[in-house]
């Protein structure tokens, strides 16, 4: 039997993670998670302001909490430089990069099963170019 560390077993609402699918969705299935992962996969290292400008309609509070969550989940790294003014950059970890094929599959599925107009992200465009 596979067990996950205690930090994954319960969230703020006391919902148990019962299977690998739930774990995966909990890790990268948040509203902004995949958008930030897509952005970092395209541009590799970005500062907070650059992420804020490129992710439409995200508030500072939502961006800050999403970045913290992605760091805690091991999907992104935070690089802080000893400069004035302070310089901080974010980049995908190997674990974060491992999510990209999953997101590509979701893009492909969505494109095949949606009859509306969708604006593809960088990862979706890469998948579309392969076809």
Placement of each model-derived feature along the sequence:
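Basic, amphipathic "hinge/linker" alpha-helix immediately C-terminal to the N-terminal HTH DNA-binding motif
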Residues: 82-103
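Non-catalytic interaction surface on structured domains
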Residues: 23, 27, 52-54, 78, ...
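Amphipathic alpha-helical dimerization/coiled-coil segments
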Residues: 2-6, 97-131
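Canonical helix-turn-helix DNA-binding module
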Residues: 49-81, 85
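N-terminal intrinsically disordered/low-complexity leader segments
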Residues: 1-16
